[in-house]
Amino acid sequence: MSLGQAGARFGPRVAGSRLDRPDPTRDGCRALSAAAVAFALVSGAGEAQVRVRTEEAPLTRSAAPGVAVLAPLSEVPVLEAPAIAASILAYSESSAEAAGDASAAGQPYRFADPFEVEATPATHGRWETTADGETAVWRLRAASAGSVSLNLGFTRYVMPPGGRLWVYTVRDGEVEEVVGPFTEADNETHGELWTPILDGAEVVIEAAVPAGRRGELDLRLGSVNRGFRDLPPEGIGSGSHASCHVDVACSDADQHRDQVRSVGLLQVSGTEFCTGVLLNNTSGVRIPLFATARHCLPLRAASIVVYWNYESAQCGDRGGGRLTDFQTGAYDRAEHRNTDFGLLELDDPPRTEHNVYLAGWRRDGALPTSAVGIHHPRAHVKSISFEDDPLSRSLRYGFTFEVADWDKGATARGSSGSPLFDQDKRVVGVLSGGRSACGNDESDYYGRLETAWTGGGTRATRLSDWLDPGGTGATTLGGRDWNGPPESAEPLYAVALRVQDGARSHDVSHAFRDLDG
């Protein structure tokens, strides 16, 4: 359900197991895409920077005579989140690494600080009705002085039929960057909606519903996440820190183009970045299973945003990537502490135009004779790293494969959870920790898929139930295009959700036959 742009550093978030806690609904969100839409055609103003598909502009920007006659934005109430504390702004990830953070390469990359709020259309903002009397419009501005970006967590989202929600920025009185509209189709069982990131220190929230359904809108803003680092982050585009990172746009990655498409930048709880990978399964049914590090998993899976295709336009740019291909929300599937493996299921299929790939995997225990890592170091554009020597097994950070010293490339914060591909281009692990960096000969450690396969012996602590749901016993599996022809007679995209309802539980099956719907 969202978009993005940001960057960051910070220490590791404490990773507790959500699977050990009551989780009455499971989490999820809907997928949207980005297409450049010239709102100038609607308003006569300059072209907006649009990062999601927007079939219509917010009513604030509509020029339809006699319809969207709304008060100027200057009259819309503002919810002021406090400026970010100086202690947070002063934090330096580079100094933490210099001080000997042994797991710097295996930690999330913090870019924002959350501020909890409790704002609803009944308590905040301003209601108006369009001149034709048909549409009720609620608007609220959210701001935090000094923030470089904002993203929002709606801890309650129920949109009535015909309703729409936008979040956008304004510059010089003009709507600039727009997310939405979100609609009734974005109502999920968990009842939440988390947005991607918009640049700047202020955003406008605008909901428009049929006038007769105003009372059916159930919206609660629960978190304003205040960005304190830009994306791309300063310092990685030049200098010694970035000197060894290899753009996937470069010819070095030509033999791994499919694998590159399987990797996404993972935004966690609106405050941190990691990396993850889409994995294939043996059923022949396309299911968006997304693996990352356990320590990257959020307390609420609804809060994740995955950005696809965040890459340099050409080799050597180390920037210029676009965050326009994204989707939000997921369900917890499995996690295993001893391998730091985490598995989510994205609650909507990736859009066709995102052109993603389901990576293959290997669990037969064979030691890779060489390896490739694909990742987003410090939430930067996608990079690729190469190890030409055989790997070894290690017990550091749990049951891991050790990359003793990358022959080309390195990792950093934000690379955490990224996949390790063996010589046959199959995933054998995800990044758990390490000291790897440009300019050193330190190791990285990847939680082993072979060990996480049986994990803790339960459905919630092992991968086998999800990657081999039919129990075929396969030890290796090739990858496949998400957009390829179906391999079974089942629906093109099928998900079985376990929904808890008090003391009762029941299975709900969702089938999505239209990937563009």
Residue ranges and their predicted role:
Residues 48-138, 185-280, 480-483:
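Protease-domain processing segments flanking chymotrypsin-fold serine proteases, especially trypsin-like
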Residues 33-42:
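Bacterial N-terminal signal peptides
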Residues 197-404, 422:
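Serine endopeptidase catalytic core focused on the charge-relay Asp
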Residues 277-287, 409-431:
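Catalytic nucleophile loop of clan PA
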Residues 311-343, 347-357, 378, 436-490:
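C-terminal cap/linker of serine protease catalytic domains
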Residues 144-151:
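Extended extracellular/luminal ectodomain segments enriched in beta-structured repeat modules
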Residues 160-173:
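Short, surface-exposed beta-strand/strand-loop-strand elements in extracellular ectodomains
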Residues 489-517:
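Beta-propeller-forming repeat regions
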